[in-house]
Amino acid sequence: MQPVHTSVLLEECLEFLKPDASDNLFVDGTLGEGGHTEAFLKRYPQLNAIGVDADVSIQERAKERLKPFGERIRFHLGWSDEFFKNYPKDFAPPNLILLDLGISMFHYVKSGRGFSFSSDEPLDMRLNPELRLSAADIVNSYNEKDLADLIFNYGEERYSRKIASRIVEQRAAAAFSNAKELADCIYKAVPQNYRHGKIHPATKTFQALRIAVNGELDRLPRLLEAAFSVLAPNGRLGLITFHSLEDRIVKFYFKELGKSCTCPENMPICKCGGRPRAEVLTKKAVKASDEEIRLNPPSRSARLRVVRKIDYRES
């Protein structure tokens, strides 16, 4: 199997999440095609891993890729926030957790679910087919204000009102059914000088729809807390984000973990014990090198943040 996706910040992840013992367990909570996991299992021969993904089709590709590692890798099909929340009691606590929040290139190129605005694929965007709403459901049913708010809040699209207005106008004649149809509508909705920028004018709207369909920003705070709670003492948690909405949430959560007191400001006496839960290992987000960006342009948006869970067992 030839992988479609190129994993970002690979060397940086391997260094920041280096095992500190031979029996360490690595959990890739966003397995995708398995690029990060393959690199960890190759670099660290004593490491065992669990790969989690909500998309059965891409997990099958990962299973094929990681077959040479045999029993060193186990797989779980489902959302990673739910996996960590219901972490099996008979599993050892993970020492290393990596969460790459980006969408795999597989979904744009091979999934057939309308993630790419240049395709005639059905406008779906669900990572898991059991989800209730597809992108087409949202585009064809939301009123103009709600649609504009969604595009602005999840896509940070400055022309969200114009785009929503054009969508509502066009769907009155015929419902949207494929991705290219929607992309062409967005292209016509925005000012001419916006049509030929660094990114396609539909990029941010498609991002917003994908986030809404899969509940990505709603899941993220739950995912962070659930993953950190099962992490072994001295374990490391790494997050790769690709847009500012995600990165702000991760940055704030890690900052809270590093605080020596988490009591409300109006509380006169500290009740939390006055000890930080984690050490932030990346004072600033780690970015891709110029060389990586040259070889893999999508990596230009990637940001890696890592924390270490402080071990108070012997203090």
From Swiss-Prot:
Species assigned in the record: Treponema denticola (strain ATCC 35405 / DSM 14222 / CIP 103919 / JCM 8153 / KCTC 15104)
Query: Which key words tag this protein in UniProt?
Result: Cytoplasm, Methyltransferase, rRNA processing, S-adenosyl-L-methionine, Transferase
Name the major location.
cytoplasm
E.C. code: 2.1.1.199
Record bears the keyword Methyltransferase: yes
Example GO CC term: the record gives: cytoplasm
Locate the residues binding S-adenosyl-L-methionine.
Answer: G34, G35, H36, D53, D100, H107
Q: Which GO terms describe its molecular function?
A: rRNA (cytosine-N4-)-methyltransferase activity
Query: Per its record, how is this protein called by name?
Result: Ribosomal RNA small subunit methyltransferase H
Q: Which SUPFAM superfamilies match?
A: Putative methyltransferase TM0872, insert domain (SSF81799), S-adenosyl-L-methionine-dependent methyltransferases (SSF53335)
Its family? Belongs to the methyltransferase superfamily. RsmH family.
Q: In UniProt terms, what function does this protein have? A: Specifically methylates the N4 position of cytidine in position 1402 (C1402) of 16S rRNA.
Q: Which Gene3D superfamilies match?
A: Putative methyltransferase TM0872, insert domain, Vaccinia Virus protein VP39
**Origin, by domain of life?**
Bacteria
Pfam families xref list: Methyltransf_5
What sort of enzyme, by top EC class, is this?
A: transferase
The record's subcellular locations are: Cytoplasm
- A biological-process GO annotation: rRNA base methylation
